[in-house]
Amino acid sequence: MPFLQISLLSIGVAADAFACSVVRGTAIQVNLFKRALVLAGIFGVFQAAMPLIGWFIGRFFAGITFIAEIDHWIAFALLGIVGTKMIWDAFQPEDDETIVDDGRVQFRPAIILGLATSIDALAVGMGLAFVEVSILKVALSMGSITFALSLAGAWIGHHGGGKFGKWATILGGIILIGIGANIVYEHLSA
């Protein structure tokens, strides 16, 4: 998988974490850098670990002969489902949850959000088990891009940019669907 495709895939799966960081950033009133760094670190670690876990699960099933014949369709379906769900979720009404800022780093909510926003990376990792790719490069790219975008998202949210999260999620969904379609196209044109 080329570098550009890995980068786009990483941006696509990082969109949910970016959106959550923007929302969390709107509530941060003190200790912005420290709290944004912790949030971005947690999101980055989850986004790096989950595709590895998914890849190992996918590789377990990749050896089954009939799956090898349809592997490109599996990758397309997983990426398409995750991308479509991201777009769908972006148009759903938001909860009117008010986040109270007590000035402390809140690890538990960050870990829950990190897990929730990385489920798509798990599915992507499963799909990538069926194509030729260096999963370590993908995992490092996903983790580092998620870290950077989450850090930026918290800063943007803190400075009044709460509306960016929705559009980032939509763009991320479109990117994932496009990469899935490209996998099928490359297989069918080979």
From Swiss-Prot:
Highest rank taxon of the organism: Bacteria
Q: Does the keyword Transmembrane apply?
A: yes
Segments spanning the bilayer are: 3-23, 37-57, 72-88, 111-131, 138-158, 164-184
Membrane topology of the entry: Multi-pass membrane protein
Q: Does the keyword Manganese apply?
A: yes
For this UniProt record, give its keywords in alphabetical order, as a comma-separated list: Cell membrane, Ion transport, Manganese, Membrane, Transmembrane, Transmembrane helix, Transport
Pfam family of this protein, just one?
Mntp
Q: Where in the cell is it found?
A: Cell membrane
Main localisation, per the record? membrane
Kindly list the GO molecular function terms attached to this UniProt entry. manganese ion transmembrane transporter activity
GO cellular component entries? plasma membrane
Q: What does this protein do?
A: Probably functions as a manganese efflux pump.
Q: Which family does it belong to?
A: Belongs to the MntP (TC 9.B.29) family.
Protein name per the record: Putative manganese efflux pump MntP
